[in-house]
Amino acid sequence: MALRLEDKKAIVAEVNEAAKGALSAVAADSRGVTVGAMTGLRKKAREAGVYVRVVRNTLARRAVEGTAFECLAETFTGPTLIAFSNEHPGAAARLLKDFAKEQANFEVKGAAFEGNFIPAADIDRLAKLPTYEEALAQLMMTMKEASAGKFVRTLAALRDQKQEAA
């Protein structure tokens, strides 16, 4: 069934709004994936704060025009699933990378982050970005280790000072 012009404009506007509020985007080929698997992917995406939509290529190109994800337009060939991360930059990449491991027919085409295109082979860089909570925990660990090291150096200096006095 062909889409009416109003429907196409609504799809472009919806995807464009998602793109404007997103931190990163991932494009994938979902050809050959069962409806049940796609439903599961959409459920996981909602839980992870990821907007997922299968869009016609021409509509997807128009939707990302003028956004940081315009570099993805070259990947819009064949059936295209586009996922936008709203809460964490690596969420969509991590979600689709894990889904591709489960589904042999699912293929990630590429990603975009801060206006830069990331090829499918390098998607791990984006997927391995720590979440806000993980980054905060790493920072706290670093600060904690630094203060422990400072305490040890202070004790060593105090010991050296006492040895010199004796």
Swiss-Prot record:
> Which key words tag this protein in UniProt?
Ribonucleoprotein, Ribosomal protein, RNA-binding, rRNA-binding
- Which Gene Ontology CC terms are recorded? cytosolic large ribosomal subunit
Question: One GO MF term, please?
Answer: structural constituent of ribosome
Subunit: Part of the ribosomal stalk of the 50S ribosomal subunit. The N-terminus interacts with L11 and the large rRNA to form the base of the stalk. The C-terminus forms an elongated spine to which L12 dimers bind in a sequential fashion forming a multimeric L10(L12)X complex.
UniProt xrefs under CDD domains: Ribosomal_L10 (cd05797)
Protein's name according to its UniProt entry: Large ribosomal subunit protein uL10
Q: Which GO terms describe its biological process?
A: translation
Q: Which organism is this protein's natural source?
A: Shewanella oneidensis (strain ATCC 700550 / JCM 31522 / CIP 106686 / LMG 19005 / NCIMB 14063 / MR-1)
Family, per the entry? Answer: Belongs to the universal ribosomal protein uL10 family.
Q: What role does this protein play?
A: Forms part of the ribosomal stalk, playing a central role in the interaction of the ribosome with GTP-bound translation factors.
Q: Which domain of life is it from?
A: Bacteria
| Gene that produces this protein | rplJ
